[in-house]
C-alpha cells in the first residue's frame, strides 16, 4: 500500500530517511477511499479492527467488512442531510462505532470534530457555535447526553442528534437511534465529487495557555502525514496488532489508532474501558498477543509498578511513547523488565509526528529523537536566530512554497491567531527544547 504514496518505502539509516523520504501526492486524496477501500479490494479478509471492552465483548472486522459498514453508515448520514463541509461532532469514547463513523464522514466530505466525553454544557455550546456544528453523534452515557440536552436550546446550528446505545437502553428524547436506523439506509452511492486536498477534513479543539480552546483545522493530506507515524515511528507492518492508549476525543487517537496504522496494513487493537487499570490492560495485551504498543509515559509508570513477570508479553515487539516528557528512570525500568526500549516521539494537535526515534536509531533516554524528514525543523531564539547545540530554543517548522504534509491549515475562523503562530515562513510550536 505505502508504495502508492512513497517513492521509497524502506530506509536503513537516518541519512537515508532524511535524503529519500518523498511523498507521491494524488489529486483529491481521500483516506477512506484511497487507503481503506483499497485495502478492502486488495485484502478483504485481512483483519482491520479487533475491538474489545472491559465487559468481555469483542468485535473482529476485516477490511472488506469495514468497507461495507462505512458505506452503509455514509448512506445513513446522507439521509439525515449530512454532506460535504458539514461539521459533525463525535463524542464516542472508545466505542467501536467511532472508527466506522470517522470513515463514513470522510466518504461524504463532512468535517469531523472528535471531542472528549468530559465536555460540559458550556463546552458543547461553545463548540457548536464556533464551528457551526450541524450534527452530534454520541454515546449513551448519561452525563454526556445530559450535557448535550442542556446545550440544545443554545445550539441553533445543530440539526441532528444521534446516539449509539448499548444493549437496548432507551433512546434519549430528541435523538436518533443509530443501532436501529443505520442499516435501513439505501445502498451507498459515492458522490461524484468529495474533496480537494486542501479542503478541511478534521478539526480539533485544543486548549491554549489562556482563553477558550483553539480550533485546529486539518486538510485531507493530514491523514497522509501520519503514514510516517504508523509505518516508521510505530514500525508497523501487515502482521502487526497495534494498541494505542488514547480516548477518541483527543488527537492522539488519530495518531495511534487510525491513519498511520492502516497505511501499514496493521490491525488496530482497541480496549474500550471505563477506568484505567494496569493489570487489566496487561491481561488484554497478553490474551490477544498485542505486538506493538503506544501510550503516554504515565501509563508506562503504572505498568512498571506491576509484576510484569506475571504476564506473557512475548508477542510484544515494539513500544513507543509521546504526550509528555519521558523520565529516563521509566525508560530504564521498562527496558529492564521487558527487554524493549521505548521509542519516544513529539508532535502537537497541529502536526503529525514532528520529532521521533526511528527503528534505525538507538533511543537515548530523555531525548525525543530527531526531526521527522517530512518537516524542516529548527530551534530558534526569541530574536528568530538559530540556536547553537546545547542552547534552549523554540521548536519551529520552516514552511517553504508548500505547507508540509501533516501540518494544520489554520486556526478555523481565527486569522489573527493563525498569524500569531504562523508568520515569516515559520510555524511556531511554542514548545521549547535543546539539541545535543
PLM regions with names:
Residues 44-47, 162-169, 174-176, 182-205, ...:
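Conserved pre-ATP/AMP-binding loop-to-beta segment of ANL
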Residues 45-103, 120-125, 178-180, 221:
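Conserved AMP-binding/adenylate-forming core of the ANL superfamily
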Residues 59-64, 193, 201-225:
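Conserved AMP-binding A3 loop
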Residues 67-72, 183-188, 216-237, 251-252, ...:
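Conserved structural elements of the adenylate-forming
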Residues 103, 107-180:
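Structural core segment of the AMP-binding/adenylate-forming
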Residues 179, 263, 290-295, 304-364, ...:
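Gly/Ser/Thr-rich phosphate-binding loop
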Residues 224-244, 248-291, 306:
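Conserved AMP-binding/adenylation subdomain of ANL enzymes
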Residues 388, 396-436:
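Conserved ATP-binding/catalytic segment of the ANL
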Amino acid at each position: 500500500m505505502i508504495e502508492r504514496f512513497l517513492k521509497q518505502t524502506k530506509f536503513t539509516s537516518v541519512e537515508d530517511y532524511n535524503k529519500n523520504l518523498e511523498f507521491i501526492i494524488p489529486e483529491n486524496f481521500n483516506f477512506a477511499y484511497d487507503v481503506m477501500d483499497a485495502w478492502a479490494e486488495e485484502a478483504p479478509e485481512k483483519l482491520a479492527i479487533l475491538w474489545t471492552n472491559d465487559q468481555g465483548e469483542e468485535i473482529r472486522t476485516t477490511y472488506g467488512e469495514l468497507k461495507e459498514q462505512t458505506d452503509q453508515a455514509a448512506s445513513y448520514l446522507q439521509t439525515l442531510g449530512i454532506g460535504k463541509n458539514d461539521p459533525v461532532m463525535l463524542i464516542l469514547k472508545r466505542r467501536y462505532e467511532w472508527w466506522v463513523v470517522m470513515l463514513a464522514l470522510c466518504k461524504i466530505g463532512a468535517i469531523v470534530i472528535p471531542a472528549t466525553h468530559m465536555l460540559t454544557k458550556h463546552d458543547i455550546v461553545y463548540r457548536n457555535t464556533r464551528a457551526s456544528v450541524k450534527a452530534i453523534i454520541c454515546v449513551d452515557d448519561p452525563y454526556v447526553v445530559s450535557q448535550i440536552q442542556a446545550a440544545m436550546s443554545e445550539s441553533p446550528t445543530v440539526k441532528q442528534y444521534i446516539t449509539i446505545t448499548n444493549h437496548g437502553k432507551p433512546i434519549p428524547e430528541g435523538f436518533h437511534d443509530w443501532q436501529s436506523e443505520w442499516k435501513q439506509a439505501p445502498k451507498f452511492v459515492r458522490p461524484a465529487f468529495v474533496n480537494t486536498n486542501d479542503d478541511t477534513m478534521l478539526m480539533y479543539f485544543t486548549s491554549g495557555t489562556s482563553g477558550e480552546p483553539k480550533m485546529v483545522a486539518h486538510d485531507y493530506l493530514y491523514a497522509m502525514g501520519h503514514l510516517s507515524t504508523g509505518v516508521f515511528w510505530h514500525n508497523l507492518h501487515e502482521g502487526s496488532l497495534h494498541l494505542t492508549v488514547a480516548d477518541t476525543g483527543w488527537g492522539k487517537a488519530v495518531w495511534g489508532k487510525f491513519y498511520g496504522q492502516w497505511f501499514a496494513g496493521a490491525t488496530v487493537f482497541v480496549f474500550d474501558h471505563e477506568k484505567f487499570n494496569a493489570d487489566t490492560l496487561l491481561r488484554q495485551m497478553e490474551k490477544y498477543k498485542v505486538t506493538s504498543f503506544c501510550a503516554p509515559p504515565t501509563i508506562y509508570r503504572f505498568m512498571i509498578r506491576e509484576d510484569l513477570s506475571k504476564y506473557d508479553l512475548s508477542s510484544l515487539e515494539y513500544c513507543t511513547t509521546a504526550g509528555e516528557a519521558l523520565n529516563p528512570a521509566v525508560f530504564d525500568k521498562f527496558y529492564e523488565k521487558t527487554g524493549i526500549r521505548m521509542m519516544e516521539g513529539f508532535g502537537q494537535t497541529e502536526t503529525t509526528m514532528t520529532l521521533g526515534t526511528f527503528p534505525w536509531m538507538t533511543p537515548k533516554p530523555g531525548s525525543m529523537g530527531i526531526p521527522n524528514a517530512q518537516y524542516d525543523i529548527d530551534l530558534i531564539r526569541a530574536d528568530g536566530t538559530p540556536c547553537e547545540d546545547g542552547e534552549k530554543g523554540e521548536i519551529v517548522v520552516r514552511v517553504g512554497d508548500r505547507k508540509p504534509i501533516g501540518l494544520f491549515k489554520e486556526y478555523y475562523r481565527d486569522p489573527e491567531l493563525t498569524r500569531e503562530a504562523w508568520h515569516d515562513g515559520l510555524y511556531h510550536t511554542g514548545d521549547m527544547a535543546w539539541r545535543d
